[in-house]
Curated annotation (Swiss-Prot):
Name of the protein in its database record: Cytoplasmic tRNA 2-thiolation protein 1
HAMAP family xref list: CTU1 (MF_03053)
Pathway annotation: tRNA modification; 5-methoxycarbonylmethyl-2-thiouridine-tRNA biosynthesis
Membrane-spanning segments: none
InterPro entries found in the cross-reference section: CTU1-like_ATP-bd (IPR056369), CTU1_C (IPR032442), Ncs6/Tuc1/Ctu1 (IPR000541), Rossmann-like_a/b/a_fold (IPR014729), TilS/TtcA_N (IPR011063), tRNA_thiolation_TtcA_Ctu1 (IPR035107)
Cell compartments where the protein resides: Cytoplasm
Any Gene Ontology biological process: tRNA wobble uridine modification
EC number: 2.7.7.-
Function of the molecule: Plays a central role in 2-thiolation of mcm(5)S(2)U at tRNA wobble positions of tRNA(Lys), tRNA(Glu) and tRNA(Gln). Directly binds tRNAs and probably acts by catalyzing adenylation of tRNAs, an intermediate required for 2-thiolation. It is unclear whether it acts as a sulfurtransferase that transfers sulfur from thiocarboxylated URM1 onto the uridine of tRNAs at wobble position. Prior mcm(5) tRNA modification by the elongator complex is required for 2-thiolation. May also be involved in protein urmylation.
Length: 379
């Protein structure tokens, strides 16, 4: 459903601790300071601006001599994070003269009762913020909807498939618009949950990307950044509430089965005792990253005798092995890939096999369809 934020107001019977003139209406979740609406807006927007400036989020577009290269896409979903992001980016772009052309980029995954409704909110945001809007669908890009993916692969795999497909869809949308930078509404809660997920899975190597403010991929030329990296979800909800922003508040139909939900519940309990638990977790993840880089430098130093014999396309990995850097193209869709198939096409190939197998039981020519499907796939 589409609604304005209805966050319950916190009763605070004192003056704002910043301006000392207006009545405080909240205790800021991050540090429990009592603030009025105006001061909360100011500190929220200033902290986002500081994140942008300190991490040079738009250095690759702000300095461009060509206006068309100053475009930045906002990953829009109609939810609270992307709605607040669009509002704040518009405000900061005008206040600090970033000189950016902001564009809303929305992906329709094909989830009935969820995405079809949230798209209406995105269209409302387009009018309210006066930004161009581009919508791409899984069906048009992949000939699959997420509802079809779930019916074939099962609900427990939904986030795995959707994460890969959505990332590539955003890249394709940005390429279509001639944009090489996307901002997303990922916040401190999201980043902390990802750090914990990677720890629980024993995937230490992924922690580096999960704590980066700016990320890029060896398989894409599109750069991504997270202006809300240090802003909590609670504060984003408060901002939406006091700004009276309209957003789509229903959770994704398939998100309840995600393991991430267990991490979210744990953080929810911990934040009641330690409000800074999310940012603390992010900082801890960044320390892992620094340790990993130090180990890599040491390994490179230990292998200095071999270094002069290596071409520029070689890299010494932390375990001492040598990786060859190659720029490949997916044989199916043409996207940059480290293997013959990009991750999205590899997953889609598996789905096509499953769909063809299912047809064996329902149609007489199912076996022929399966054989034809297998012949068309490259692994």
């Amino acid at each position: 459903m589409v609604e304005s934020s209805n966050t319950k107001k916190v009763k605070v019977s004192s003056l704002c601790e910043l301006c000392h003139g207006r009545k405080a209406v909240m205790k800021r979740p991050k540090n429990l300071r009592k603030l009025c609406k105006e001061c909360f807006f100011h500190v929220f927007e200033t902290e986002v601006h500081n994140t942008i400036v300190e991490n040079k989020l738009f250095a690759n577009v702000e300095n461009s001599e060509f206006p068309e290269r100053r475009a930045v896409a906002i990953g829009a979903s109609g939810g609270k994070d992307s709605t607040v992001l669009a509002s704040v980016m518009k405000t900061l772009n005008e206040r600090y003269n970033y000189g950016l052309k902001l564009v809303l980029l929305c992906i329709d995954e094909g989830i009935k009762g969820y995405r079809d409704h949230s798209l209406e909110t995105v269209k409302m945001n387009q009018k309210e913020y006066d930004m161009p809007l581009e919508i791409l669908s899984y069906k048009d890009l992949y000939d699959w909807t997420m509802d079809e993916v779930v019916s074939c692969a099962g609900i427990r795999s939904s986030c795995t498939y959707c994460g890969v497909l959505r990332r590539q869809a955003l890249d394709k949308g940005a390429e279509k618009l001639g944009i090489n930078h996307i901002v997303t509404g990922h916040n401190a809660d999201d980043m902390a949950e990802t750090v914990l997920l990677n720890l629980l899975r024993g995937d230490i190597n992924r922690i580096e990307n999960s704590t980066k403010i700016i990320t890029d991929s060896e398989n894409s030329v599109i750069q991504r950044s997270k202006p809300f990296a240090y802003m909590s979800q609670k504060e984003i909800v408060l901002y939406a509430h006091y700004k009276n922003l309209t957003y789509f508040s229903t959770e994704c139909t398939y998100s309840e089965e995600a393991f991430r939900g267990e991490c979210r519940s744990l953080f929810h309990s911990l934040s009641a005792v330690l409000p800074s638990v999310h940012t603390n977790t992010i900082y801890s993840g960044q320390q892992f990253k620094r340790k990993a880089k130090a180990m890599k430098r040491q390994n490179n130093k230990n292998n200095k005798n071999n270094k002069n014999n290596m071409a520029d396309e070689h890299e010494v990995l932390p375990n001492g092995t040598v990786a060859i850097k190659e720029s490949k193209r997916c044989k199916k869709c043409g996207s940059l890939a480290s293997n013959d198939l990009c991750q999205a096409c590899f997953l889609l190939a598996g789905l096509e096999v499953s769909r063809a197998k299912v047809s064996i039981d329902s149609e007489g020519d199912g076996a022929a369809k399966l054989s034809k499907t297998l012949e068309g796939l490259t692994f």
